Amino acid sequence: MQYNVQDLVKEVRVALDNNNSSEPLLQLGDGSTLSINEIIESKIADAARIILQEAPISLLGEGSPISGKIYWPSGEIGKGWGHILLPDNFLRLLCFQMSDWDISVSKTIDENSPQYALQKSRYNGIKGNPQKPVVAIVSWGTGLHLEFYSCTAGSNISVRKARYIAIPKIEAGKITFSEKLKSAIVYYTAFMVAQELSRDENFIKSLLEQAKELIK
């Protein structure tokens, strides 16, 4: 869902006011009311990114489709492992499933994972397969790639599901994220602002705890 950033700023101000019992908001820092609003706005995208990374899949919404050419290192379509170049704004995988897989994958590994080394083994029994597929997000020279292990269907193979969560970005005064995460993002933004402008550790901790509670 798309939100007006200025509306979110107002909600963050309310969260700060409602949770701060030690001193008025305007005394949190040396800035004016306008500068505090600017600080809030500057934290919203970062707060949204952190919450989107930490929230469970069930709260993330529909995301965006992954499209692009599939490359098959084996030289044979639909045999072995493949990879797809991910969009520049990729943040997190929502789901991925090839047409011959029994299940969809949302949890990924990277090149530093012990499981990743197994995918390069010459023994098929320990690599990802249509019954227990594995997806890795790996940095190539051309950008991030989604590597998937593996397929056996041959030339009739296709992508059944492929969706991702994009890095949140403020554009034309608006930002997009799942409505299920709105309250958590508001409170995490308030937490980040309080970290910068308040010395009250209990106040800061309270905001963080509320943000975390909202994504359980």
What residue spans do the PLM features occupy?
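Glycine-enriched, solvent-exposed interface loops adjoining structured elements
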Residues: 1-216
